[in-house]
């Protein structure tokens, strides 16, 4: 018989995923509601991994229309400082890459693993509302201060190969879990048993109902 573990929600996301930004209020609400009953972890998916630095312009042209759909469906708002880059692709100096925000999250989770969902949400707010460049080391300083993480330690780790490898391990794990798009939410109940709870944006009521259904099934199995 397989080992029972504390049921764990894995939220697979990418810092640059606009739909994940729209999903942030849903997953943070779920994390708050199920605190103590479920464990939570966030895995970065490595959505943007250019072989060489690639300018934001092609992505910006897509976002010019797509962001409105995200706002309409989720109720989230993109900030003017972010949208400036979206609507001035010829002037922006952004070269998006998922690696650094993934490394930053790996470091932050090490200090406060129970806050992983909130940290991921804050990283996305920093980009999509405040318009911070997540490839710039300074984009993280306010979060390091907010979460009371030792600054020198954080920045040493941000430049280290060790934490880059941790981020790449998460990218590989997300692929191994057969995640093909973001956001994605999985619930692990045994060493090898996972339930897919969300693939793409999912509203709070739907996600909560799916979680409760799985938890009810687990409890039923354990009493039989």
Name each region found by the language model:
Residues 4, 99, 179-180:
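A generic fold-level signal
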Residues 4-10:
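Extreme N-terminal starter segment of soluble prokaryotic enzymes
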Residues 7, 38-40, 183:
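Residue-level recognition of the N-termini of beta-strands and the immediately preceding loop/turn
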Residues 11-12, 16, 23-32, 122-224:
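C-terminal cap of thioredoxin/glutaredoxin-like
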Residues 24-127:
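Structural alpha/beta surface segment adjacent to cysteine/selenocysteine redox centers
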């Amino acid at each position: 018989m397989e080992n029972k573990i504390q049921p764990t929600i894995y939220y697979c996301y990418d810092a640059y995923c606009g739909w994940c930004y729209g999903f942030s209020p849903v997953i943070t609400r779920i994390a708050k509601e199920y605190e103590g009953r479920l464990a939570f972890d966030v895995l970065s998916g490595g959505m943007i991994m250019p072989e060489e630095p690639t300018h934001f312009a092609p992505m910006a042209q897509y976002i010019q229309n797509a962001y409105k759909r995200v706002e309409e469906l989720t109720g989230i708002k993109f900030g003017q400082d972010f949208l400036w880059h979206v609507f001035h692709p010829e002037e922006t100096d952004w070269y998006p890459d998922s690696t650094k925000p993934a490394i930053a999250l790996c470091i932050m989770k090490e200090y406060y693993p129970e806050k992983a969902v909130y940290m991921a949400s804050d990283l996305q707010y920093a980009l999509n509302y405040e318009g911070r460049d997540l490839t710039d080391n300074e984009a993280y300083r306010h979060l390091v201060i907010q979460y009371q993480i030792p600054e020198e330690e954080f920045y040493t780790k941000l430049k280290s190969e060790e934490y880059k490898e941790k981020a790449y391990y998460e990218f590989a794990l997300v692929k191994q879990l057969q995640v093909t798009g973001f956001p994605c939410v999985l619930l692990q109940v045994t060493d090898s048993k996972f339930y897919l709870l969300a693939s793409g944006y999912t509203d709070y009521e739907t996600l909560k109902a799916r979680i409760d259904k799985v938890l009810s099934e687990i409890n039923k199995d354990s009493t039989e």
